[in-house]
């Protein structure tokens, strides 16, 4: 039965991981021949059982960890270290308590050829884009968790990256705040104003994944491999209460069996 997902993906690659192998220092093999592409203007999700290595993979994609074998490329060029063009938004909310909101955002512009006045203006603009217009002088202790996460996301926006790597970015927020932030991020990134942007997100929340993603990669096994990749073809906006949405959701849950060690 057609439920809106097809096992075929066509991409115009912005970020690409090819033949990634990785093991921890203790010899534990984590990944075996991982291949992932993030196409232009695409929202990519990576799912899999807990402990499979999704966050570790995100760090490899961002240049924070070096694979044992394989290559990560940004716009066709090998990526060997973290660069401003690839922004990582952590699961834990990272803000610096001695800096106000705009100063937190300005940190991502330190490598750019900008005056302080230009950085302040850019920081205010980025905060406004995530719904914090007029809150630029607040310190983290004066903000809710949702506001602090918006500051962290505004900091990533201000760097003008090609790719956003998002590690469970809504995990510690209440559902109402998370829903508003999800929609804000999607609208900002894919409104047509930033056509080169791509997102790769890892999440345990499959409803969230299905609501946002264009393409979904499924990790499983030990060492982890990509056991499936699917394209979501449902029209937007997607209604989590619809029969079509729930049929897709059931299919995704079927992939999340406990990982098995490869023979």
Question: What name fits each language-model region?
Answer:
Residues 106, 117-135, 184-190:
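Conserved ABC ATPase "signature" region
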Residues 62:
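Helix-to-loop junction immediately C-terminal to a conserved catalytic motif
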Residues 47-49:
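The feature captures the beta-strand-to-loop junction immediately N-terminal to the Walker
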Residues 70-81:
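Conserved ABC transporter NBD signature motif
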